[in-house]
C-alpha cells in the first residue's frame, strides 16, 4: 500500500510540475507578444485553441458517456450458473472468479466509464486542436470570384470549405471508430462466458447498439466519398494535373456508386436489427468491396486504354485547356504581358539612354564578394557577414544598384576563454553596421569600391546610418539581457572598446524577482537568479532571429529564405521579409514542390527594425483571398501597403524565390494552344551557365535597365529562356518593381527566324576563344585559382549584351580579386581588365564609354596598347598605397600591396623584353 501511495504521489508531482512548466512558458509567450505589440495574436490563437478543444472534448465525452450509459444499463445480472467446479460448487457470472463483471456493471463502473469518456475525449480533441486555423478560415472565408470547370464551385470552396469538411469528417470518424472499438470490447468481455456456453440472450441489445454505430460509420463514409469526389480536381495520374477524361467518366462515377452503396449498407445493417437477415449484410459488404476494387482501379484503367488512348487529344483537349488556364491563374502568369523583341544589333553604346544600364551591370557575385567582405571588413573574429543583399538606391543623385552585407555578431566565434555567461548574455549583445559597395565599381587591387565601410561607419557618398547596431538579424539566435549594470560592448576602437546601452522599447522588463525566477525557469538559466548585474529595469530580448520572430507572429505564412537589409531615409536599418500564401488546393494547377503546393502569392511584406525588433505586416497583394481571410482572423496584424513609409516602399523587391517558380512554370505553360501543349512542340528551358568550373542552372538576377518602349531606367528581375531542343535564346521574362509598376510581369519573345545566342552558347564561345583560354591556362600554371562568375544576359536597345566577371584567387590567399571582365556581343567575345575597356574593344573606335567602374572616360587611344606605361602606373599606385598603409599601421595591407608591387615589376620586366 505504501509503495502504491508513493508511486501515486510521484505521478501527481510530475503532472503538477509539467503543468507549472507549461503555464510558465505560456505566460512568457504572453509577455513576449505584449512586448512586440501583438497581444491580440496570442489571445486569438489561445482562445481559438481552447474553444475548439473544449467543444470537441465535451462533444466526444458526451457521445461516449451516453453510449456507455446505455451499455451499462443493458448488461443486467446473469443468474444462471455456468458450471460446477470439482467440489460441486456452482459458479455464477458475478462470482469472485469473474471480478470484471462487477467492475463493468457495479457501482464502481461509473468511474470506469467516466474515465474512458474523458480519455477518449482527450485523444480526439488533442488531435483536432491544431486545426483551429482551419475552422477560422472557414468562418472568415472570402470567395475567389472564379469557379472550377467541373463542379462549378467557387475556388474558395476548395481552399476553405472542403478543408473544413474533411477536418470534421476525420474527427467524427475517429470518434466513432474509438467508440465502436470500446463498446465492442466491453460487450465481448461482459458476455465472454455466455459465448462459451451458447447463452446468446444477452446479445439482443448489444447487436442493435453495435449495428446502429456501424450504420453511422457507413453513413459518414458516404459523406467521405462525396468529399473525396472533389479530389479528382487534384489528380496527378493523368496527362495533366487535375481531372482528365478517365477521372470524370470513371473515378467520379465510382465515388458516386460507392456513396450510394454506403447508404444502402447502412440501411441493411439497421434493417437487420429487425429482419435478422445477416446474409444481406455480407452481400452488401461484398458488393462494396468489389465496386471499390473494380471501379477504383480496373474500370478507370480500361477507360484509359480502350477509350482515351486511341483518341487521346480529342478526349483530353478540354482538360488540357483547364490545366493551362488554371495553372497560369494560380501563379499569376495570366497577367504577364507578352511583347516582341525585334533584334537588329545596331547598338550605340554611347547613347545616353544606356548609361544607367552600363553603370549598374553587376560584376560582383555574392559568393566571392562575401569572402572579400569577410577578409577586408570583418575586423574581429566574432563578427560575421552571413549574406550579401542586392538593392537599388539613389546615391549622390544617381540611380545605383548596390551590394550590402550586415556585420552581425556570432558569439560562437568568441575566444573560448571569453565565452562567459556575462559576455554571452549581457555584454556581446549586438552586431554593428554594414558594408556597401556598388555592383560595377572595382578598386585597383581588384577589390570592391566601398561606399560604406569600417567601424564606426565611414561613408564616401551621401548614404548615412544613424543607428548601426544590429540586435535582430539572420545570424542572431540567442536571447540577451540589456539595460543591466554591465555595459554592452558596442564596437572596437583600436586597442580600446566603446560601450553602449540599449535604448529600444522592445524586450520584456524583469520588474521583479518573481519574473526573474520565471525567466530562469523557462529559459533554463539559473544564473539569471544569481546575477547582481540584472535590475528590475533590465529587458530580456528574445526571438532575435528575424525569421523565427515573424514566424511566431504569423506561423501560417511561408517565408522567403533571403531577407534583405535596407538603409532607410532616416538612417535606420530595417529588414524586409517576403511572406507567401501557399496552398495545394487550386484545381488543375500544376504543383511546384513535393508537397503538391500549386498556388503562390507574395501577399505580405514584413518590415523588422534591426535595432528594436519592431515588426509591421503589410498586405502587398490585396487580390489574394487567402490573405484577406487571414486579415479577418487577425485584423490588428495587417496594414495596407500604402501605410508603409515611402522610403521603405521604394526598396521593395520582387522576390527571387517566387520569380524562380513562375519562370519554372512558364517554361511549359507559355504554350496556351492545347494542341501545341499536348504535342510538347515548344517547351522552354532555363539555360545553364558556368560558375567556378561547374555547369549550373541560371538563377534570376536583378538589373537596372531601360525596358524597350519605356522612357526611364528601372529595377527589374529577369530570366532568359532557351528552347528544349536548341541552345539559342527564345525570350526572356522580367518582373518590374519600381513605383506603380511593382509586380507587373513582361515576357519578351525573340523573332523565331532569328538566332540569338543563348547563355550556354556564349559560355562555349568563351571556352573556345584561344586568347582567353591561354590566359586562363597561364594563371592556372602560376597557381592561381580562376573563378568564373555569373553570366549576365543584358538586353539593350534592340540588342543583347553578355557580361561575365572573372575572379582570381591565389592558392595561399583566400581573397578573390576581380581581374577580368568578359563581354560578348553578336559574334565577338573579348576579355579585358575592366568593363569599360571591354565595351570599347567590342564596339570599336567610334564609341565612347564612360563607366562608373573607374570613374574616368576611356577612349580608343587609352586602350592597353602601351602595356609598359600602364604597368608602371600600377606599380607607382601600389607603392604609394603601401607607404600610406605603413604610416597607418596596417601591416597586412602593406604586405599585400608590396606583394602586388613585386608582381607588377615582374610583369614590367617581361613586357620590356625585346
Curated annotation (Swiss-Prot):
Keywords: Cell membrane, Membrane, Transmembrane, Transmembrane helix. The keyword Transmembrane applies. GO terms for cellular component: extracellular region; plasma membrane. Disulfide bonds: none annotated. InterPro entries: UPF0182. It is found in: Cell membrane. Its main location: membrane. It is a multi-pass membrane protein. The keyword ATP-binding does not apply. The chain crosses the membrane at residues 10-30, 45-65, 115-135, 169-189, 214-234, 255-275, 280-300. HAMAP family: UPF0182. Belongs to the UPF0182 family. PANTHER family: UPF0182 PROTEIN SLL1060. This is UPF0182 protein Swol_1161. The lineage of its organism: Bacteria, Bacillati, Bacillota, Clostridia, Eubacteriales.
Amino acid at each position: 500500500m505504501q509503495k502504491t501511495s508513493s508511486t501515486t504521489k510521484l505521478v501527481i508531482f510530475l503532472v503538477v510540475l509539467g503543468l507549472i512548466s507549461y503555464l510558465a512558458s505560456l505566460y512568457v509567450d504572453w509577455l513576449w507578444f505584449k512586448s512586440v505589440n501583438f497581444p491580440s495574436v496570442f489571445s486569438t490563437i489561445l482562445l481559438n485553441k481552447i474553444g475548439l478543444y473544449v467543444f470537441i472534448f465535451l462533444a466526444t465525452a458526451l457521445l461516449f458517456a451516453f453510449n456507455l450509459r446505455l451499455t451499462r444499463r443493458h448488461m443486467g445480472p446473469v443468474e444462471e450458473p455456468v458450471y460446477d467446479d470439482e467440489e460441486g460448487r456452482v459458479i455464477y457470472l458475478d462470482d469472485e472468479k469473474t471480478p470484471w463483471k462487477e467492475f463493468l456493471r457495479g457501482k464502481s463502473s461509473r468511474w470506469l466509464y467516466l474515465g474512458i469518456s474523458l480519455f477518449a475525449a482527450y485523444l480526439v480533441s488533442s488531435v483536432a486542436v491544431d486545426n483551429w486555423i482551419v475552422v477560422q478560415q472557414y468562418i472568415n472565408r472570402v470567395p475567389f470570384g472564379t469557379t472550377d470547370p467541373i463542379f462549378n464551385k467557387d475556388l474558395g470552396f476548395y481552399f476553405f470549405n472542403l478543408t473544413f469538411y474533411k477536418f470534421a469528417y476525420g474527427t467524427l470518424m475517429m470518434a466513432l471508430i474509438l467508440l465502436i472499438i470500446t463498446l465492442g470490447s466491453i460487450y465481448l468481455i461482459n458476455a465472454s462466458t455466455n459465448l462459451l456456453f451458447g447463452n446468446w440472450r444477452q446479445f439482443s441489445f448489444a447487436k442493435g447498439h453495435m449495428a446502429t454505430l456501424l450504420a453511422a460509420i457507413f453513413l459518414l463514409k458516404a459523406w467521405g466519398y462525396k468529399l473525396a469526389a472533389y479530389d479528382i480536381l487534384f489528380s496527378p495520374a493523368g496527362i495533366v494535373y487535375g481531372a482528365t477524361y478517365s477521372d470524370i467518366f470513371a473515378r467520379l462515377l465510382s465515388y458516386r456508386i460507392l456513396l450510394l452503396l454506403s447508404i444502402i449498407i447502412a440501411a441493411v445493417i439497421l434493417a437487420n436489427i429487425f429482419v435478422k437477415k445477416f446474409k444481406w449484410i455480407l452481400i452488401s459488404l461484398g458488393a462494396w468491396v468489389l465496386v471499390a476494387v473494380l471501379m477504383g482501379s480496373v474500370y478507370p484503367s480500361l477507360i484509359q486504354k480502350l477509350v482515351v488512348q486511341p483518341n487521346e487529344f480529342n478526349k483530353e483537349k478540354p482538360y488540357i485547356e483547364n490545366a493551362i488556364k488554371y495553372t497560369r491563374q494560380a501563379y499569376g502568369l495570366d497577367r504577364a504581358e507578352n511583347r516582341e523583341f525585334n533584334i537588329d544589333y545596331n547598338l550605340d553604346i554611347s547613347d545616353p539612354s544606356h548609361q544607367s544600364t552600363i553603370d549598374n551591370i553587376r560584376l560582383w557575385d555574392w559568393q566571392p564578394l562575401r569572402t572579400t567582405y569577410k577578409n577586408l571588413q570583418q575586423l574581429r573574429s566574432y563578427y560575421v557577414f552571413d549574406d550579401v543583399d542586392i538593392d537599388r538606391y539613389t546615391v549622390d543623385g544617381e540611380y545605383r544598384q548596390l551590394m550590402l552585407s550586415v556585420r552581425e555578431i556570432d558569439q560562437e566565434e568568441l575566444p573560448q576563454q571569453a565565452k562567459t555567461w556575462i559576455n554571452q548574455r549581457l555584454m556581446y549583445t549586438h552586431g554593428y553596421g554594414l558594408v556597401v559597395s556598388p555592383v560595377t565599381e572595382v578598386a585597383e587591387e581588384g577589390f570592391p569600391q566601398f561606399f560604406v565601410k569600417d567601424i564606426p561607419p565611414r561613408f564616401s557618398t551621401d548614404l548615412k546610418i544613424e543607428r548601426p547596431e544590429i540586435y535582430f538579424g539572420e545570424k542572431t539566435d540567442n536571447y540577451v539581457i540589456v539595460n543591466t549594470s554591465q555595459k554592452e560592448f558596442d564596437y572596437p576602437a583600436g586597442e580600446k572598446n566603446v560601450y553602449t546601452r540599449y535604448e529600444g522599447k522592445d524586450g520584456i522588463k524583469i520588474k521583479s524577482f518573481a519574473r526573474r525566477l520565471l525567466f530562469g525557469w523557462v529559459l533554463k538559466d539559473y544564473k539569471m537568479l544569481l546575477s547582481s548585474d540584472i535590475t528590475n529595469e533590465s529587458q530580456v530580448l528574445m526571438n532575435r532571429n528575424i525569421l523565427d520572430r515573424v514566424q511566431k507572429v504569423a506561423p501560417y505564412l511561408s517565408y522567403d529564405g533571403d531577407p534583405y537589409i535596407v538603409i532607410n531615409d532616416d538612417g535606420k536599418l530595417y529588414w524586409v521579409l517576403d511572406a507567401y500564401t501557399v496552398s495545394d488546393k487550386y484545381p488543375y494547377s500544376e504543383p511546384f514542390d513535393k508537397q503538391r503546393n500549386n498556388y503562390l502569392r507574395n501577399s505580405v511584406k514584413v518590415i523588422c527594425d534591426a535595432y528594436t525588433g519592431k515588426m509591421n505586416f503589410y498586405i502587398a497583394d490585396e487580390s489574394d483571398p487567402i490573405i484577406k481571410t487571414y486579415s479577418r482572423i487577425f485584423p490588428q496584424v495587417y496594414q495596407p501597403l500604402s501605410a508603409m513609409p515611402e522610403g521603405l516602399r521604394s526598396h521593395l523587391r520582387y522576390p527571387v524565390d517566387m520569380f524562380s517558380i513562375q519562370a519554372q512554370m512558364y517554361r511549359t505553360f507559355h504554350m496556351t494552344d492545347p494542341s501545341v501543349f499536348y504535342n510538347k512542340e515548344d517547351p522552354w528551358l532555363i539555360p545553364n551557365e558556368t560558375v567556378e568550373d561547374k555547369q549550373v542552372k541560371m538563377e534570376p538576377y536583378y538589373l537596372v535597365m531601360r525596358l524597350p518602349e519605356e522612357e526611364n531606367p528601372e529595377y527589374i528581375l529577369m530570366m532568359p529562356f532557351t528552347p528544349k531542343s536548341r541552345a539559342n535564346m527564345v525570350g526572356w521574362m522580367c518582373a518590374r518593381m519600381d513605383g506603380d509598376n511593382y509586380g507587373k510581369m513582361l515576357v519578351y519573345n525573340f523573332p523565331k527566324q532569328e538566332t540569338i545566342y543563348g547563355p550556354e552558347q556564349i559560355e562555349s564561345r568563351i571556352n573556345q576563344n584561344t586568347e582567353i583560354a591561354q590566359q586562363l591556362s597561364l594563371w592556372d600554371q602560376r597557381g592561381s585559382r580562376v573563378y568564373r562568375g555569373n553570366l549576365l544576359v543584358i538586353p539593350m536597345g534592340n540588342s543583347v549584351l553578355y557580361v561575365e566577371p572573372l575572379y582570381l584567387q591565389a592558392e595561399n590567399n583566400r581573397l578573390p580579386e576581380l581581374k577580368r571582365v568578359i563581354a560578348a556581343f553578336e559574334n565577338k567575345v573579348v576579355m579585358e581588365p575592366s568593363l569599360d575597356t571591354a565595351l570599347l574593344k567590342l564596339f570599336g573606335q567610334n564609341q565612347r564609354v564612360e563607366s562608373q567602374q573607374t570613374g574616368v572616360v576611356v577612349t580608343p587611344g587609352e586602350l592597353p596598347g602601351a602595356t609598359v606605361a600602364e604597368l608602371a602606373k600600377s606599380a607607382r599606385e601600389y607603392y604609394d598605397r603601401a607607404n600610406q598603409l605603413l604610416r597607418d599601421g596596417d601591416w597586412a595591407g602593406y604586405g599585400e600591396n608590396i606583394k602586388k608591387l613585386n608582381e607588377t615589376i615582374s610583369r614590367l620586366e617581361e613586357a620590356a623584353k625585346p
